[in-house]
Amino acid sequence: MNGSADAGPRPRKYVFITGGVVSSLGKGILTSSLGALLRARGYRVTAIKIDPYVNVDAGTMRPYEHGEVFVTADGAETDLDIGHYERFLDMDLSRGNNLTTGQVYLSVIQKERRGEYLSQTVQVIPHITDEIKERIRKVAEEQKAEIVVVEVGGTVGDIESLPFLEAIRQFRFDEGEGNTLYLHLTLVPYLETSEEFKTKPTQHSVATLRGVGIQPDILVLRSARPVPEEVRRKVALFTNVRPGHVFSSPTVEHLYEVPLLLEEQGLGRAVERALGLEAVIPNLSFWQEAVRVLKHPERTVKIAIAGKYVKMPDAYLSLLEALRHAGIKNRARVEVKWVDAESLEAADLDEAFRDVSGILVPGGFGVRGIEGKVRAAQYARERKIPYLGICLGLQIAVIEFARNVAGLKGANSTEFDPHTPHPVIDLMPEQLEVEGLGGTMRLGDWPMRIKPGTLLHRLYGKEEVLERHRHRYEVNPLYVDGLERAGLVVSATTPGMRGRGAGLVEAIELKDHPFFLGLQSHPEFKSRPMRPSPPFVGFVEAALAYQERA
């Protein structure tokens, strides 16, 4: 940590973030923002998300219920908050950074079956709580973190969270008061009718937290508008928290404002003080510039996302963030027009895409809306509108090209039509004998070998890159030569994949198009505010150019 080099190693610090009153207050953004403030002070930080559900991971959950599944470099299917952590901290996390009830109980039961608890009665305390603490410490050690920020999902008072709250309570007993900090995020509603903030829900939430043995050191009050100083002092008095340790987190236009807003109020210094750390002035210049561009862009461009889950934008959270990062890089604001892919099957496409300068077809599963996505890809190809296809979006582009350019009537994916005469998209050979759904796809970082002279090579500026993946189907290698003869450019492959000759198709593009790119990977998962994804930067740049021509 910061300080004298001869002071010797210092104890690791732990910050535990809980939430009260209602769920979905933004604990993930608060955790990410605090992590960013500590990183800006030069500390090595990691963040862990605790999810109290019994699922082992988020891989099989419905996007409409849980939002996107974020994939880590090591192939874990995790909660979307892990994506927030990676973007704000600008670092790769791992499967250990998302801890679930399912993982904990599965591990404890397996240990019991192996005889590791021989002669013991296995109980929530100490066996479950010890497993939780062991997993948190293991991540901290593996990632060489000086400060570990742990978000406890759910709401204080939920029965599912009790073992985790007990485990983090024990951390103070194990590590000492100066090495642990409890931060509680809670709702302070503002009543328009009486024009006042109501603090009673927060008081009850803190009382519930104290009932399980945790006295919060810091409170962050979530509200639609800034909570005034006198209200914060009242909350401090009734919750036994220092007045200078109660902060306001109002709704903001851009989430990248949150670290700046909290730092301006002194949250970073309060955490330093509570953990016995030296005062360090953070370097927040990037965040300040990013917010300036978002609030005062030089240009604005509209992109259509033709997807299946358009009524739940969180299902495409990393896509939206990657577009935002690309917009910042191009000093532009990216507006998104949500287009229900199913509606495109019979829609007037001129009307559906009338005011957009780019079309993006995201990843997804299932047959619903597929033909609408095919029509969107055809429209982009024929009208020379910039097109970016992600995962399924690449497969859609190949299906459309095969049908309408290569002359393969009825071409399709075996996922949607098992009896198609031309299975240009087919199940990967490695997936033929896979049983079960959870964690069984081609997941995580895989290498892409890029062909020189292609659009993709211009975007990345190198011949091999790593990108995240999450798929079971691929471009059928038996059709690649014929598609290339018809004019499709295979601009990247993964070398050495079994039974594929030149390798699994990772990217396709068109020569006679200003920007038509399909990627089997999910580059949005590696896009960061400081290091935006090259395909997204190029896509937004092309959309801006198209807008100027139009």
Curated annotation (Swiss-Prot):
ATP binds at S24, L25, G26, K27, G28, I29, D81, V252. The active site is at C391, H522, E524. HAMAP family: PyrG (MF_01227). Keywords: ATP-binding, Glutamine amidotransferase, Ligase, Magnesium, Metal-binding, Nucleotide-binding, Pyrimidine biosynthesis. This is CTP synthase. Homotetramer in the presence of UTP and ATP. Is in a protein concentration-dependent equilibrium between monomer, dimer, and tetramer in the absence of UTP and ATP. It comes from Thermus thermophilus (strain ATCC 27634 / DSM 579 / HB8). The gene is pyrG. Mg(2+) binds at D81, E151.
